[in-house]
C-alpha cells in the first residue's frame, strides 16, 4: 500500500483541480527551482523531451513577456487516452490528448503539438491565476491562450511564421458563417459549451493582436502585467482588462472594447489588384 499527499495552498478555481493515475514513465525536467515533469506512456519515454522539452524555455519567455514570473509551485504535463478535447489547463497538472505522443519519425519534421503546449502553459496566467468571472467572459481565458501561440511563434520562429499561423487561425473563425453575429463577451448562450468556439478562441486572439498593435508593445504587455497583479488568485472580466490597459497607456479604450469585445462582426474588405 502507498499513500500520497498533495497540497495546493494557493487559491484557484475548482474546475481546474485534477488528479491523474496510471502506468506512466515520468521524465523530470526543471526551470529555475521549479519541477517540470512529463508523464507519458512508457513506449514514448525516449521521445518525451522532444515533445515537451521546450517547456522550460516557454516558462522563461512567458514570465519575462508578462513581467510576472510563473506563479505556481510546479508544472506537470500528462497524457490521457480518449480525452474529450485537445488538452486542459488544470492548475500545475495539464492533461493532453494522446495525440501529443509522437515518435522520432514524426518529430523530425515538426512537433505538431508545440502550440498546444504553449497554449496550456499560458493559461496558468490567463485562466488559472486570473480566471474568467463567468463563461460570458471566457475571452480573458481562451483569447489570451490562443494569442500565446502567436507570441511563442514570433519569439521562436519569427514574425512571418507567427503571422502565417495567425491567418490560419482566423480562417477557423471565418469557416463558420454564424460567428459573424456572436459577440466576444456574451451574456446569453444556451450552454456553456457554446462559448468554446471560433469567436472566443480564434477571433479573440486576433483582436488581442490588433489591440497590441494599437497600443504598442510596452503599453500592451505592461497593461497585461497590471491586470494579472490586480486580479491575481481571483476572477477577471473584460472591463478589468480595459481598466489596466487604460491605466498604463493613458488612452480611453471604451470605444475599442465596445466594438470588439461587446460587439460582433468583422471588417469586410473589397480588394482590387491593378
PLM-predicted stretches and their roles:
Residues 1, 26, 271-274:
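Short amphipathic beta-strand and strand-loop transition segments with alternating hydrophobic
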Residues 1-24:
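Extended, low-hydrophobicity, Ser/Thr/Pro/Gly-biased non-transmembrane segments
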Residues 6, 35-274:
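Hydrophobic alpha-helical and helix-loop surface patches within well-folded domains
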Residues 24-31:
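Short acidic-hydrophobic surface loop/beta-edge motif
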Amino acid at each position: 500500500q502507498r499513500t500520497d499527499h498533495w497540497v495546493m495552498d494557493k487559491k484557484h478555481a475548482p474546475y481546474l483541480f485534477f488528479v491523474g493515475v496510471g502506468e506512466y514513465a515520468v521524465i523530470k525536467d526543471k526551470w529555475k527551482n521549479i519541477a517540470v515533469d512529463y508523464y507519458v506512456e512508457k513506449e514514448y519515454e525516449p521521445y518525451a523531451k522532444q515533445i515537451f522539452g521546450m517547456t522550460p524555455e516557454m516558462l522563461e519567455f512567458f514570465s519575462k513577456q508578462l513581467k510576472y514570473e510563473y506563479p505556481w509551485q510546479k508544472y506537470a504535463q500528462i497524457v490521457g487516452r480518449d480525452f474529450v478535447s485537445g488538452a486542459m489547463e488544470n492548475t500545475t497538472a495539464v492533461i493532453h490528448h494522446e495525440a501529443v505522443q509522437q515518435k522520432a519519425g514524426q518529430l523530425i519534421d515538426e512537433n505538431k503539438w508545440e502550440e498546444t503546449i504553449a497554449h496550456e502553459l499560458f493559461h496558468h496566467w490567463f485562466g488559472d491565476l486570473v480566471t474568467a468571472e463567468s463563461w460570458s467572459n471566457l475571452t480573458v481565458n481562451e483569447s489570451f491562450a490562443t494569442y500565446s501561440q502567436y507570441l511563442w511563434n514570433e519569439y521562436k520562429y519569427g514574425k512571418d511564421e507567427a503571422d502565417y499561423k495567425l491567418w490560419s487561425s482566423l480562417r477557423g473563425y471565418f469557416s463558420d458563417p454564424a460567428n459573424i453575429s456572436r459577440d466576444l463577451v456574451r451574456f446569453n448562450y444556451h450552454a456553456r459549451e457554446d462559448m468554446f468556439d471560433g469567436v472566443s478562441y480564434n477571433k479573440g486572439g486576433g483582436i488581442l493582436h490588433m489591440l497590441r498593435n494599437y497600443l504598442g508593445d510596452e503599453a500592451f504587455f505592461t497593461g497585461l502585467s497590471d491586470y494579472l497583479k490586480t486580479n491575481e488568485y481571483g476572477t477577471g472580466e473584460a472591463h478589468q482588462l480595459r481598466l489596466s490597459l487604460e491605466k498604463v497607456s493613458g488612452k480611453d479604450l471604451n470605444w475599442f472594447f465596445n466594438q470588439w469585445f461587446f460587439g460582433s462582426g468583422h471588417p469586410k474588405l473589397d480588394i482590387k489588384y491593378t
